[in-house]
Amino acid sequence: MSRIKVIFFDAAGTLFHVKGSVADIYLAHAEKYGVKRTPDLADSLRNAFARAFADAPPPVFAVSDPKEIKRCERLWWFDVVHNVWYRVGMFERFDDYFDDVFDAFGGPSYWAMYPDTPGVLRGLKEQGYELGIISNFDSRLFNVLRGLGIADLFDTITISSLAHAAKPAPKIFQLALDKHAMDPDDAVHVGDSRRDDVEGARKAGLQAVLIERESQIGSSASNIPVIQTLEQLPALLAAL
């Protein structure tokens, strides 16, 4: 029988995903401000977002006041989105455009759960596991989870801006463990990033499971437990 008592999950890319693509949503909003859609622009936006997001610093801020944290989160994303459009072509009224996009991603409209998410989470709760989220998402995550109808399935939610640490730093994992009064050996973390989720969790002493939803053959790294759907998780837990 598994000794695991608490299961942590990454959020976006693990439990839910963007409907369509970020680039398509950015472009749809930009059309309201006079930007003309072309296939080349859509491709350029996809590449620009990938680079801008990868180049962004960790979303960790030296403030503690909730209002200041939200302000910093918004500025962090402003820099990312500005960087995207700086690469492909800026347009007038960008500040208004950014407000529209940022607020739109703050609810469930542009997010969709993976089909296996709610059933697996409820099943794990019924088996007695404690569930938590460890994510580099910002504080909009709470509203997204409520909108998707799964917020009440989690005992804790730990995000980087409130934890003052971002994955893969061990600190954010330890803070999440402390909320459950658990030791690292009692926990497993499930996520879609080798660096942030697997390496980060292991450095903090947790076991880790990589979810590769787009993969059909699994991971080439035999020392990493890999699943393609959350439905495979319960059987894997029994072996941990």
Regions found by a protein language model. Give the residues of each.
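N-terminal helical cap/lid subdomain that shapes the substrate entry/recognition surface
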Residues: 2-119, 126-127
